[in-house]
């Protein structure tokens, strides 16, 4: 079981890192080209094999297909990113937990909690990401770190604790605000790529928590 769990954790980390990259910065021309490659389309097809993710992956692929016919695709998609994630909160979907859980204020209690968690795990935020620690990209990257770190554990008691910690992080730091974030993305993202990405992130995180809870019961 330990070997199977290590493979699963590597796949989970890969998906979390990928999701993090979508909200980290605007996609470049090279990034967009990769999204049209056979390798990435195969990766997305694999995700779609999960019934709970099928609809959201389908919406993301449809948006990527529309992107191929969008004039000035990179510039327009960068404008979508800016309008959604970098402007004022009134007509946007700011990707910070504090905005949704702490009176709409930036850099609130969730950011402080994330700073403490990152410090406790020795995780440093990438220097060129000048953002509060409760940014969605940072939280997703941290989950990837937790998944990979669990692969260093050899004792079942410690493994159970690591699985519980990941499930708790999802409950306490993501599911408290991600549904509202995804809803705002859907409301304000006219083209639909980032709203599809947000809904897919939510669906995957919900599925992952269910999986973690089942694994915890098996190892506890």
From Swiss-Prot:
In the UniProt record, does the keyword Chaperone occur?
Answer: yes
Alphabetized InterPro entries for the sequence: Chaperone_TorD, DMSO/NO3_reduct_chaperone, HscB_C_sf, TorD-like_sf, TorD/DmsD_chaperones
Asked if Cytoplasm is a keyword of the record, the answer is yes
Q: Please provide, in alphabetical order, the Gene Ontology terms of the cellular component aspect for this entry.
A: cytoplasm
GO annotation (BP), single: protein folding
Q: Which UniProt keywords apply?
A: Chaperone, Cytoplasm
Superkingdom, natural source: Bacteria
Which compartments is it annotated to reside in? Cytoplasm
Q: What does this protein do?
A: Involved in the biogenesis of TorA. Acts on TorA before the insertion of the molybdenum cofactor and, as a result, probably favors a conformation of the apoenzyme that is competent for acquiring the cofactor.
**Protein family (similarity comment):** Belongs to the TorD/DmsD family. TorD subfamily.
Q: What is this protein called?
A: Chaperone protein TorD
State the organism named in the record. Answer: Vibrio cholerae serotype O1 (strain ATCC 39315 / El Tor Inaba N16961)
């Amino acid at each position: 079981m330990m070997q199977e769990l290590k493979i699963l954790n590597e796949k989970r980390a890969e998906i979390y890192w990928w999701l993090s990259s979508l909200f980290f910065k605007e996609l470049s021309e090279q990034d967009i080209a990769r999204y049209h490659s056979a390798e990435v389309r195969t990766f997305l097809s694999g995700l779609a094999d999960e019934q709970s993710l099928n609809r959201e992956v389908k919406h993301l692929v449809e948006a990527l297909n529309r992107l191929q016919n969008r004039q000035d695709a990179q510039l327009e998609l960068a404008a979508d990113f800016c309008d959604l994630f970098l402007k004022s909160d009134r007509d946007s979907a700011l990707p910070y937990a504090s905005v949704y859980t702490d009176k709409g204020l930036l850099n609130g209690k969730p950011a402080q909690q994330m700073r403490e968690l990152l410090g406790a795990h020795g995780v440093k935020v990438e220097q060129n990401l000048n953002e509060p620690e409760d940014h969605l990209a940072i939280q997703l990257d941290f989950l990837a770190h937790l998944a990979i770190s669990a692969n260093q554990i050899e004792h079942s008691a410690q493994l159970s604790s690591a699985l519980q910690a990941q499930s708790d992080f999802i409950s306490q730091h993501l599911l408290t605000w991600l549904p509202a974030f995804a809803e705002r993305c859907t409301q304000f993202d006219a083209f639909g790529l980032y709203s599809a990405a947000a809904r897919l992130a939510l669906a995957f995180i919900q599925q992952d928590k269910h999986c973690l809870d089942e694994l915890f019961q098996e190892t506890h």
